[in-house]
Swiss-Prot record:
Superkingdom of this protein's organism: Eukaryota
Proregion residues excised on maturation: 22-58
Residues making up the signal peptide according to the UniProt record: 1-21
Keywords tagged on the record: Disulfide bond, Hormone, Secreted, Signal
UniProt organism field: Arabidopsis thaliana (Mouse-ear cress)
Site (Required for proteolytic cleavage): R54, R55
The protein's name in its UniProt record: Protein RALF-like 31
Location of this chain's protein in the cell: Secreted
MF terms in GO: hormone activity
Lineage: Eukaryota, Viridiplantae, Streptophyta, Embryophyta, Tracheophyta
InterPro entries, alphabetized: RALF
GO BP terms: calcium-mediated signaling; cell-cell signaling; regulation of growth
One Gene Ontology CC term in the entry: apoplast
Family (UniProt): Belongs to the plant rapid alkalinization factor (RALF) family.
């Protein structure tokens, strides 16, 4: 009789100890995993705008060509020309039309203000 009682007590103690070592998955396990994932994704809110921009550019996988990265590359051989189209003439040539509102080099005495 003593051996059977000791065996039952030993079995109960073994089950209690093993319950801590091998947890039974709860139905909330999936919910907990989703909450952890959302908290990891939510960490992006604290990032600097430059870090967010860097991550967006990395995700788009757009690359700068090697020609662009060369130091000795001159976009336009004509001095003073615009780098965009290499046309002759100044890059920022000042030319403005003459409208009534600008009051440019003409008789503006007849304009009612």
């Amino acid at each position: 009789m003593f051996n059977s009682t000791a065996l039952v007590i030993f079995a109960i103690l073994f089950l209690l100890i093993s319950a801590d070592a091998f947890p039974i998955p709860s139905p909330n396990g999936e919910i907990d995993a989703m909450l952890i994932r959302n908290s990891i994704i939510g960490e992006d809110e604290d990032l600097m705008p430059t870090e967010i921009s860097r991550r967006v550019l990395m995700a788009q996988k757009r690359y700068i060509g090697y020609e662009t990265l060369r130091r000795d590359m001159v976009p336009c051989q004509k001095p003073g020309a615009s780098y965009y189209d290499c046309r002759s003439g100044q890059a920022n040539s000042y030319s403005r039309g003459c409208d009534t509102i600008t009051r440019c080099a003409r008789d503006t005495n007849d304009i009612n203000t």
